[in-house]
A protein has these predicted regions:
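Residue-level recognition of tetratricopeptide repeat
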Residues: 34, 68-69
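Conserved alpha-helical positions within TPR/SEL1-like repeat arrays
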Residues: 2-13, 36-43
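Acceptor-substrate binding/catalytic loop of class I
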Residues: 237-252
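A short glycine-rich, Lys/Arg-flanked "PGG" loop and its adjoining helix->strand segment in the class I
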Residues: 211-226
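Class I SAM-dependent methyltransferase SAM/SAH-binding core
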Residues: 142-187
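A conserved beta-strand element that flanks and buttresses the S-adenosyl-L-methionine
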Residues: 199-200
Length: 291
């Protein structure tokens, strides 16, 4: 069964979707209660536009795996069969970053594939104008890929993340003063008027509505403090769940939210964040200043 799934994934990556479909169907014939086989078959059907069949597969995946580590409910939301959740479900996110943590540092070395950290670095350095060392929060710090960039500027450097696997990697580099395994909203609600700069690299892609998290970030910043962050760009709606199950937001949405909270946009740059299955993922990098 595993061999058929591996073959199906290889064929899918090669664009041989009909052959991949046959391979996943064979896996299901051999083991009908294998959630990953139904999920992968659903992705094939979704890709070729057989949405009703895709829905059946994702519903079956949920039936077999109620914890939904694979993200079947999010797939159903992209097909209009579920309400888009306010945030990336924790079970899915933990599984996602558990896999990512094993090769994240290698991915970030491949700047032809992943450029998110470089874009944040440029935004931070372009707008940093404080001669003294500052208090920095690396929000959703992951494995700590930005720590070596931020450390020379930091009086204190704090990292917060929800993934234990990512935080273990961040601990190994010994560049943070403190690391916390906490929900970001919970952590922010516990600190007020504390940070000179808050960094959120590929973090807001896990939040559908940004009103509350922006309010908490503003409250956690000192006056004239800066918020450096990236979003995946959405061009059709104000906010959306994209095809690879992350949230995207429009420039108008961010601008309106910043205006409402009296956060001044001092930097904005559109660029390619990364490549997902050979497709470019457009992003916007911002720096907002608390007035």
């Amino acid at each position: 069964t595993e061999a058929h799934i591996n073959l199906g994934n290889t064929l899918k990556d090669q664009g041989k979707l009909k052959e991949a479909e046959a391979s996943f169907r064979k896996a299901i014939t051999l083991k009908p209660d294998l959630a990953i086989a139904h999920y992968n078959l659903g992705k094939i059907y979704k890709k070729i536009g057989k949405n009703s069949k895709a829905v059946e597969c994702f519903e079956k995946t949920l039936e077999l795996n109620s914890e939904d580590l694979l993200g079947a409910a999010l797939q159903l939301a992209t097909l209009g069969k579920r309400k888009i959740p306010d945030r990336t479900p924790e079970n899915f996110m933990q599984g996602f970053y558990k896999k990512k943590s094993k090769h994240w540092s290698n991915l970030e070395k491949k700047t032809h594939k992943y450029r998110g950290h470089l874009l944040i670095e440029n935004a931070f350095k372009t707008t940093h104008n404080n001669s003294e060392k500052i208090d920095i929060l690396d929000m959703g710090c992951g494995t700590g890929s930005l720590a070596k960039i931020l450390r020379p500027y930091a009086r204190t450097l704090v990292g917060v993340d929800l993934s234990s696997d990512m935080l273990l990697k961040a601990e190994e580099i010994c560049l943070y003063d403190s690391l916390y395994k906490k929900d970001l909203s919970q952590y922010l609600s516990e600190v007020s008027n504390h940070y000179d700069t808050i960094i959120a690299a590929a973090v807001l892609i896990h939040f559908y509505d940004l009103d509350n998290i922006f309010f908490l970030i503003k409250d956690s910043l000192k006056i004239n403090g800066k918020f450096v962050f990236s979003i995946f760009e959405e061009t059709q709606k104000s906010k959306n769940l994209n095809s690879f199950l992350m949230y995207a937001h429009s420039d108008d949405y961010i601008t309106t939210l910043a205006d409402r909270l009296n956060l001044k946009i001092i930097y904005k740059q559109k660029d390619i964040h990364e490549y997902h299955k050979m497709n470019s993922v457009p992003a916007i990098i911002y720096v907002l200043e608390k007035k």
